């Protein structure tokens, strides 16, 4: 017993000692260089469903040398970034929103000047990741502040705000504050536990408790939630910090059937979500893909979800099931049947018997579903179909591979068959589904398209999406707005309104109108007509607004105005996606750009640009280089190998990354749950061309806003980088106050925030800001006293010093904001509206993208100055350059370097060229005259080019008038040299380059392809594989090589050891565009690139005719590649040496799809979902799930297996063959990153091999892990780096024939199958 007492006493003393000495979270050994996060705060203000979130992170570098400071945040996928600031060394740097090409231009100039810069694209994913890193000097602090805005969607009866809480470490001051203000009142609010994953669960919200340290304070129209976890609370979740989502779920009171209408400052928002309506009956047809790609887990998950869905059908509903592959099977051919218990049980038995096999015939399946619905409506004796809503739920995991496969034909057939009477809801299961086609199908037929991610919760995803549309309450909803709207038709129509969702309409009323009438007409159950009328008066700013008691009311007008812009941009992007001609897409894109610049939103057409002075970079660089040892190799600031952050060079590297668990194809279009059925598609004839004349594009520029002189009171006229050093300070006024040096928040913790009456403008006018975490009082009562910290009155401006700040405190400055925005942005004029031009109806949002009242009138400010930019006619394409495009490469993970996104200029006019001009769009696409729904062929790959052609040197035509910058068009962008800055032209008048740059956030390219172009043209990939080594091509020469390598080599086989061959490269031969990681071609000659090196190994294998060689064997990746040898006549005088070529290459894959591709000298065959034969003489493109096969130029076959494996097979033929030459095949590994470390084979073993080139006692040798040294000699070899370019002499480490087996590690026979 005494021993136990002793242990207890020791444990107790140790516990006390740990409590007394505890100063922060335990730092693991691996994170010894991690910076200390002193504060992390998130503040969300929700006003009428529109949320503004500000995230602030403060990092301190306690180390003696500079270290990388990283700020990353998961953003909601429908959110727009509206502001970003960074404070380093007491200086605040404010990001600006620029047109994306202009931002790229700034990036180029800054990069060329040695300033740090980076850029990245936005992708439409379930969540976006914003990431930025910078080198932080020792003993300094950096403050990151990011603001974004979003409209909360109503799903299944509630709104949900998701805040990503991932600081990456334990933080002493960690806080979240969420304020929700709703005019009609809040009926329900719940805070579920922190969500550590995105997988769905069956747990109901009411069954779980809120996280500890959560405080909820409710008022009639306001709710405030605070979450301030202590270090112990954080440690109980994770020892390395919280990595979860904080959720707020709530619903509002909606008593009026017409909904909630709010009018502020000539902008209105209408929320339509009536309660208490009886559900309508529905006739639903489930169309389920049962092709071979659905085999296994996906089919089981589909059956599980369908069993639950069938059980949830109402007794009065009618339903049917169609399964399809390359054949279509209708469960009840006579039509839909009633959902009785017996019929549902019979349907489940039918589901149980479904098996996956065959190809995918999308067209026939949807036409069969249309036929079933039409037959059910016409069939007598099946009960009245009056008032029954026809729905099709279409589930597929692939793309059309059987029957009609042309997208435009499928769209036309389905559109005609459904007759705009049936709502089609498409579910894209997995990454291989053609989501673009499915989305078009749904949007054109009164529905939406959603993704189902291949996760363990796929069945719950299917069930959840069905629940959203399982209860139709109204059909053909028509909302008329009486009282005068601006630039839009006074009505909006929706196909359906489903229970638990919400329709949102945003628009502008005529100036001075004080009342807006709303008339509702819709169909209810049994086709009963529902009619209602409501009149809403405009709200004056002097009237009492809703909000939390005892606090200043939120500036609702400010939120409504920004909400209108958010909704409008989303609707314009949606309309852009649906537009069928290029001109309309250009005009819609121009309007998106105008609004994005005006409201400071980062959208697919704008970018975020931040400037960091060069002096700051040099200071950090000097400090770092000083801390480095004398023997340390420091990278140069002008290194061409990228913008990665190191201890020698400060850099900001923002990234937008999505979780790998739920990959989605890169699109940034916003989808909507319901589309306005009467919305009319704009055509080129209905919209005016850009500019004042059909040959020019008029682009306005703005003069810089004048900066008032600094006031005596100490206020700063404008927060520019030239002012005195400032830092962000917490304030309950909702602003970021610039302070003078020395007034740091951690040095002066007693700085008092402004009180509730203080109104201080935000740094960015028009953008609501929020205080830092320091000001969040987790115990502050809802009814606070005057003078206590409270919410800001957002958007209010003042030129006086805040009363809440003590005047006696020195060094505190306030901010005075001019009338116009600090950084006036150029606007692209939208076409003016004519009286006879049709308007789009008021848009509505149901659950996704809102439908808005589109206005085609420009809203340029009075100080706008127009400039005209003209372009010369695009030059005539080279007749030697073929014109058939290559399909785009599959999406691969983007490397951290921004060069993979860069492109080269396209057609730049010559000073001596024709004087005619071509109109261009804001996206760099020329608008041909007359306007046609096509794009110039320069945007696409050429027919006989597996790789993009060389860039030709051109000159830029001078400006048409003094002071106007020139423009250039984008070419089919080919990859740029690794590490080099992109060479993009500016497409809008560029502003003066700021003093420095560090952040450039660029969105994904917004393609403007017409529907027909999407089918026949393939835009080049902007994601070149990381292993490509890009070189700058010569200016002369012609890449017209026909693939006859041995003609170039000067004889059959082309001895690789003959350095002194008299046959050299022809004059003008271009260097390579990329280097293959490994290849085998010729005798056969093997060329292997040493991993992580630029060096190559060359060797020849003495094979035997008829042998089947194992080239790649990777069971883990499910890949097997073999080659069969063909005998060839020996060289004169070398009859003892056998010569062989490859005559057949066989590629077999069983993961994730089972395919066998056999390539011979005469044909190509594919076995998978059936057998298909292709001819070398017929160019062909074949796309299957996880497979792309492209035959081009009768000599090249590109084979892609998923995103990480790509091979090239060349067929060599000779016009005038000698007795030594035979037709044969060559095999090249273009992308082998998908091979596992366990890969074997003559080529596969080298992909991840631990092999190095060293200098031994006997000279250079190759050293492999646990292997003998292999002697090599440095020679030259004619290497073929590109399928369309001539071979070139290149250095190669030659392995003698007698040492080849020593290099391989096994005898030759071990590789013979």
UniProtKB/Swiss-Prot annotation:
Q: Domain of life here?
A: Eukaryota
- Compositional bias (Pro residues) at which positions? 876-888
Q: Which PROSITE patterns match?
A: VIT, VWFA
Query: Which ranges are annotated Polar residues under compositional bias?
Result: 623-640, 864-875
Cite a GO CC annotation.
extracellular region
Its chief place of residence is secreted
VWFA domain boundaries = 283-469
Q: Where is the VIT domain?
A: 24-150
Q: Name one GO biological process term.
A: hyaluronan metabolic process
Instruction: List the signal peptide residues.
Output: 1-23
What keyword terms does UniProt attach to this protein? Glycoprotein, Protease inhibitor, Secreted, Serine protease inhibitor, Signal
Instruction: Indicate yes or no for the key word Secreted.
Output: yes
Q: What Pfam families would the database entry show?
A: ITI_HC_C (PF06668), VIT (PF08487), VWA (PF00092)
Where are the residues of the annotated region Disordered?
A: 612-644, 783-817, 856-928, 959-983
Q: Where in the cell is it found?
A: Secreted
Composition bias of kind Low complexity appears in: 907-921
* Coiled coil, from the record: none
Residue positions the entry lists as glycosylated:
83, 374, 540, 594, 971, 1231
Q: From the UniProt record, which GO molecular function terms apply? A: serine-type endopeptidase inhibitor activity
For this protein, the record's InterPro entries field holds:
ITI_HC_C, ITIH, VIT, VWF_A, vWFA_dom_sf
Q: Which family does it belong to?
A: Belongs to the ITIH family.
Q: What is this protein called?
A: Inter-alpha-trypsin inhibitor heavy chain H6
- Give the lineage: Eukaryota, Metazoa, Chordata, Craniata, Vertebrata
The gene for this chain is: ITIH6
């Amino acid at each position: 017993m005494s021993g136990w007492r002793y242990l207890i006493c020791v444990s107790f003393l140790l516990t006390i000692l740990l409590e007394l000495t505890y100063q922060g979270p335990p730092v693991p050994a691996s994170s010894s260089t991690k910076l200390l996060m002193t504060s992390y705060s998130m503040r969300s203000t929700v006003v009428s469903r529109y949320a503004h979130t500000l995230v602030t992170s403060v990092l301190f570098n306690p180390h003696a040398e500079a270290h990388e400071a990283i700020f990353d945040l998961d953003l909601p996928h429908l959110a727009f970034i509206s502001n970003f600031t960074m404070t380093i060394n007491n200086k605040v740097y404010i990001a600006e929103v620029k047109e994306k090409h202009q931002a790229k231009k700034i990036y180029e100039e800054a990069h060329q000047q040695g300033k740090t810069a980076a850029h990245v694209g936005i992708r439409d994913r379930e969540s976006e990741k914003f990431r930025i890193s910078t080198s932080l000097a020792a003993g300094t602090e950096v403050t990151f502040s990011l603001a974004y805005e979003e409209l909360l969607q109503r799903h299944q009866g509630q709104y949900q705000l998701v805040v990503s809480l991932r600081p990456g470490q334990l933080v002493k001051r960690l806080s979240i504050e969420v304020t929700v203000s709703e005019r009609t009142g809040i009926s329900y609010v719940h805070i579920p536990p922190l969500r550590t994953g995105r997988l769905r669960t069956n747990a109901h919200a009411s069954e779980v408790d809120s996280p500890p340290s959560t405080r909820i304070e409710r008022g009639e129209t306001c709710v405030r939630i605070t979450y301030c976890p202590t270090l112990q609370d954080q440690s109980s979740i994770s020892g390395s910090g919280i990595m979860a989502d904080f959720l707020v779920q709530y619903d509002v009171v909606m008593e009026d059937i017409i909904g909630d209408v709010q009018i502020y400052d000539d902008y209105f928002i209408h929320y339509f979500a009536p309660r208490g309506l009886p559900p309508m009956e529905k006739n639903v047809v489930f169309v389920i893909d049962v092709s071979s790609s659905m085999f296994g887990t996906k089919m089981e998950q589909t059956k599980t979800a369908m069993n639950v869905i069938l059980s949830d059908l109402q007794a009065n509903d009618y339903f049917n099931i169609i399964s399809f592959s390359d054949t279509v099977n209708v469960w009840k051919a006579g039509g839909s049947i009633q959902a009785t218990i017996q019929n549902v049980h019979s349907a489940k038995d039918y589901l149980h018997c479904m098996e996956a096999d065959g190809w995918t015939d999308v067209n026939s399946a949807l036409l069969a579903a249309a036929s079933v619905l039409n037959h059910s409506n016409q069939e007598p004796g099946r009960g009245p179909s009056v008032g029954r809503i026809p729905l099709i739920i279409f589930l597929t995991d692939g793309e059309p591979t059987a029957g009609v496969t042309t997208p435009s034909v499928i769209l036309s057939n389905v559109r005609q068959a459904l007759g705009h009477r049936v709502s089609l809801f498409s579910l894209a299961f997995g990454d291989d589904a053609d989501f673009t086609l499915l989305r078009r199908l749904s949007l054109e037929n009164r529905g939406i398209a959603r993704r189902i991610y291949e996760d363990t919760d796929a069945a719950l995803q299917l069930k959840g999406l069905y629940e959203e549309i399982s209860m139709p309450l109204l059909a053909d909803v028509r909302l008329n707005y009486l009282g005068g709207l601006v630039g839009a038709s006074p009505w909006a129509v929706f196909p359906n309104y489903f229970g638990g969702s919400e329709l949102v309409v945003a628009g502008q009323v005529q100036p001075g109108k004080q009342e807006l009438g709303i008339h509702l007409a819709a169909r209810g159950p049994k086709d009963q007509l529902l009619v209602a009328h409501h009149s809403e008066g405009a709200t004056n700013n002097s009237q009492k607004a809703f909000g939390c008691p005892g606090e200043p009311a939120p500036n609702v007008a400010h939120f409504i105005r920004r909400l209108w812009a958010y909704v409008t941009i989303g609707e314009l992007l949606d309309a852009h996606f649906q537009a069928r001609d290029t001109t309309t897409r250009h005009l819609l894109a121009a309007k998106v750009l105008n609004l994005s610049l005006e409201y400071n939103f980062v959208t697919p057409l704008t970018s975020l640009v931040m400037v960091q002075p060069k002096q700051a970079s040099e200071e950090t660089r000097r400090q770092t280089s000083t801390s480095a040892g004398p023997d340390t190799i420091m990278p140069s600031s002008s290194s061409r190998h990228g913008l990665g952050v190191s201890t020698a060079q400060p850099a900001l590297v923002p990234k937008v990354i999505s979780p790998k668990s739920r990959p989605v194809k890169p699109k940034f279009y916003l989808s909507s749950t319901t589309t306005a059925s009467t919305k009319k598609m704009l055509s080129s004839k209905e919209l005016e061309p850009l500019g004042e004349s059909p040959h020019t594009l008029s682009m306005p520029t703005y003069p810089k806003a004048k900066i008032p002189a600094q006031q005596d009171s100490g206020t700063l006229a404008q927060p520019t980088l030239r002012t005195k050093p400032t830092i962000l300070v917490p304030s309950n006024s909702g602003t970021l106050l610039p302070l003078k040096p020395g007034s740091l928040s951690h040095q002066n913790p007693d700085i008092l925030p402004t009180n509730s009456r203080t109104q201080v403008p935000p740094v960015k006018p028009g953008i609501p800001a929020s205080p830092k975490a320091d000001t969040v009082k987790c115990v502050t009562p809802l009814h606070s006293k005057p003078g206590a910290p409270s919410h800001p009155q957002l958007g209010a401006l003042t030129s006086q010093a805040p009363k809440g700040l003590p005047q006696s405190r020195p060094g505190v400055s306030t901010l005075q904001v001019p009338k116009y925005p600090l950084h006036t942005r150029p606007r692209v004029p939208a076409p003016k509206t004519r009286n006879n031009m049709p308007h789009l109806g008021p848009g509505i949002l149901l659950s996704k993208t809102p439908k808005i009242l589109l206005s085609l009138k420009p809203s340029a400010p009075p100080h706008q100055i127009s400039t005209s930019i003209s372009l010369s006619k695009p030059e005539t394409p080279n007749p030697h350059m073929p014109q058939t495009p290559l399909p785009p490469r599959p999406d691969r993970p983007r490397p951290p370097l921004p060069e993979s996104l860069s492109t080269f200029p396209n057609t730049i006019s010559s000073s001596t060229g024709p004087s005619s001009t071509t109109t261009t769009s804001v996206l760099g696409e020329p608008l041909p005259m007359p306007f046609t729904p096509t794009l110039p062929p320069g945007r696409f790959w050429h027919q006989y080019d597996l790789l993009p052609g060389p860039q030709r040197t051109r000159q830029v035509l001078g400006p048409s008038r003094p002071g106007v910058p020139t423009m250039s068009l984008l070419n089919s962008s080919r990859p740029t040299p690794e590490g080099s800055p992109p060479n993009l032209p500016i497409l809008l008048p560029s502003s003066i380059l700021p003093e420095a740059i560090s952040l450039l956030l660029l969105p994904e390219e917004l393609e403007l392809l017409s529907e027909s172009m999407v089918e026949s043209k393939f835009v080049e990939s902007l994601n070149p594989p990381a292993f490509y080594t890009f070189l700058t091509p010569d200016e002369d020469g012609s890449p017209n090589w026909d693939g006859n390598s041995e003609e170039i080599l000067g004889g059959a086989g082309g001895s690789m050891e003959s350095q002194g061959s008299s046959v050299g490269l022809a004059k003008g031969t271009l260097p390579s565009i990329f280097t293959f990681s490994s290849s085998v071609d010729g005798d056969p000659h093997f060329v292997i690139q040493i991993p992580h090196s630029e060096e190559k190994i060359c060797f020849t294998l003495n094979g035997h005719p008829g042998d089947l060689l194992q080239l790649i064997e990777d069971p883990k990746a499910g890949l097997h590649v073999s080659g069969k040898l063909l005998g060839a006549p020996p060289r004169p005088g070398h009859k003892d040496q056998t010569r062989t070529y490859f005559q057949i290459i066989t590629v077999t894959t069983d993961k994730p799809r089972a395919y066998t591709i056999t390539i011979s000298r005469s044909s190509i065959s594919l076995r998978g979902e059936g057998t298909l034969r292709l001819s070398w003489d017929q160019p062909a493109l074949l796309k299957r799930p996880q497979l792309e096969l492209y035959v081009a130029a009768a000599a090249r076959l590109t084979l892609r297996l998923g995103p990480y494996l790509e091979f090239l097979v060349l067929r060599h033929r000779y016009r005038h063959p000698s007795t030594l030459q035979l037709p044969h095949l060559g095999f090249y590994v273009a992308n082998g990153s998908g091979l596992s470390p366990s890969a074997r084979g003559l080529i596969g073993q080298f992909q991840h091999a631990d092999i190095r080139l060293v200098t031994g006692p006997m000279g250079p040798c190759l050293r492999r892990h646990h292997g003998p040294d292999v002697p090599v000699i440095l020679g030259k070899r004619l290497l073929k780096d590109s399928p369309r370019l001539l071979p070139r002499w290149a250095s190669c480490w030659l392995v003698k024939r007698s040492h080849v087996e020593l290099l391989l590690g096994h005898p030759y026979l071990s590789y013979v199958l």
